[in-house]
Curated annotation (Swiss-Prot):
Function description: Has an important function as a repair enzyme for proteins that have been inactivated by oxidation. Catalyzes the reversible oxidation-reduction of methionine sulfoxide in proteins to methionine.
Catalysed reactions, semicolon-separated: L-methionyl-[protein] + [thioredoxin]-disulfide + H2O = L-methionyl-(S)-S-oxide-[protein] + [thioredoxin]-dithiol; [thioredoxin]-disulfide + L-methionine + H2O = L-methionine (S)-S-oxide + [thioredoxin]-dithiol
Gene3D superfamilies from the UniProt entry: Peptide methionine sulphoxide reductase MsrA (3.30.1060.10)
Keyword Oxidoreductase: yes
Similarity-based family: Belongs to the MsrA Met sulfoxide reductase family.
Enzyme Commission number, as recorded: 1.8.4.11
Protein name, entry field: Peptide methionine sulfoxide reductase MsrA
Keyword rRNA processing: no
Organism classification: Bacteria, Pseudomonadati, Acidobacteriota, Terriglobia, Terriglobales
UniProt entry keywords in alphabetical sequence: Oxidoreductase
UniProt xrefs under PANTHER family: PEPTIDE METHIONINE SULFOXIDE REDUCTASE, PEPTIDE METHIONINE SULFOXIDE REDUCTASE MSRA 2
Pfam family, one: PMSR
């Protein structure tokens, strides 16, 4: 089993999308990259803690490669928007890859370089590629948020 952690705006739709991929064993919504221990959603929404809304993914690398997760990640959001996605703005909504190994770092950066060379997006990619920090699981009401409410999609 391996881990991947991505921030792509509001974590509700991101979590639901990754749950649908074959080889993904579990997905948890949470917060990462900030300076406050055990933050709450209310804390993170102040835009003062430095945390991003993220999903932490447990996946089987024999069934789905990290590159495939990256393809899904870049297809879920606009990685050229700095600190926002759609109507949501603030550093908590930044585009970020928290890598769990030097290999993930290399693969993620090469993936971004390839997307840039292919001119896949009309503006520069601003996605951060940074070492994984402490993942703080979000409150239970954020887990499987769309599923619990019978919603198919979020605004991402």
């Amino acid at each position: 089993m391996a881990k991947a952690t991505f921030g792509a705006g509001c974590f509700w739709g991101v979590e639901a999308s990754f749950r649908q991929l074959h080889g993904v064993q579990d997905v948890a919504a949470g917060y990462e990259g900030g300076k406050l221990d055990n933050p709450t959603y209310r804390d993170v929404c102040t835009d003062l803690t430095g945390h991003a809304e993220v999903v932490e993914i447990d996946f089987n690398p024999d069934e789905i490669r990290f590159e495939q997760l990256l393809e899904a990640f870049f297809g879920l959001h606009d990685p050229t928007q700095l600190n926002r996605q759609g109507p949501d703005w603030g550093t908590q909504y930044r585009s970020v890859i928290f890598y769990h190994s030097p290999e993930q770092q290399t693969v993620a950066q090469a993936f971004i370089d390839r997307l840039t060379a292919e001119k896949r997006f009309p503006r520069p990619i601003v996605t951060q590629v940074v070492p994984a920090a402490t993942f703080w699981r979000a409150e239970e009401y954020h887990q499987r948020y769309l599923e619990k409410r019978g919603l198919a999609t979020c605004h991402i």
